[in-house]
Design a protein with these regions (language model features):
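Alpha-helical transmembrane bundles and membrane-interface segments of multipass inner-membrane proteins
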Residues: 1-214
């Protein structure tokens, strides 16, 4: 499979899953609704935030707009870099796959920010409507990002003997995220874990090219 095919399939499939899961949550749950699907530690918990990963916020209004604009600029540069890596014979398929995941993560949350405020009604105390007659809940570029995956694997009071945090409530994993967030995390993790392999291949090929052209 070519690097171009890997990139296209990764982007299309991951983006469809991201948006399908968000739209499903918006059209079937109210903000704050939750249900468990694996014991008590794997849950779908519907929340919306102003745009940062894992449920974190960057403020509303101007701050929200600037975050969206920054993401659009980042997507441009990631797309350009990815296209260069696809053309570069020295780059590995694994690196292209990881970059594609990072691009999906950025694009997925941009779609929420740009469009969701216009195409959905609000979800507070009600299930949202798609294309409401009265209009959406926010202006263009001011939509909220939909998060839903919640894994509170451990929740409890830490033992007193633990320095600084002993006796305090602790929750792991407390962040609520979506498929786009997961794509960014996995993409970055792949690059960090296999960076020596990815960039060693490029360095080796550079040396071979130099040796063959004295």
């Amino acid at each position: 499979m070519s690097k171009k095919t890997i990139a296209i399939l990764t982007i299309v499939i991951s983006l469809v899953i991201d948006q399908a899961s968000k739209i499903w949550v918006k059209l079937t749950m109210r903000s704050g609704d939750e249900f468990m699907y694996i014991g008590n530690w794997a849950r779908i918990h519907f929340v919306e935030n102003e745009g940062m990963a894992f449920g974190m916020s960057f403020g509303a209004g101007f701050g929200k707009l600037m975050l969206t604009v920054f993401r659009i600029i980042a997507v441009y540069f990631i797309t350009y870099y990815l296209s260069q890596q696809i053309k570069d014979k020295k780059s590995s398929k694994g690196f292209v796959f990881a970059l594609s995941l990072i691009l999906v993560g950025a694009v997925g949350n941009i779609i929420d920010s740009i469009f969701y405020g216009q195409i959905f009604s609000h979800s507070e105390g009600q299930i949202a409507t798609l294309f409401p007659a009265e209009g959406g809940y926010a202006k263009w570029f001011h939509g909220r990002v939909v998060d839903m995956f919640y894994f509170p694997i451990y929740r409890g009071i830490l033992p007193e003997w633990i320095p600084f945090f002993g006796g305090k409530f602790f929750e792991f994993f407390q962040f609520i995220f979506n498929v786009a967030d997961a794509c960014i995390t996995v993409g970055v993790a792949i690059i960090l874990l296999f960076q020596k392999q990815f960039f060693k291949e490029e360095a080796t090929q550079d040396i071979q090219a130099t040796s063959s052209n004295p």
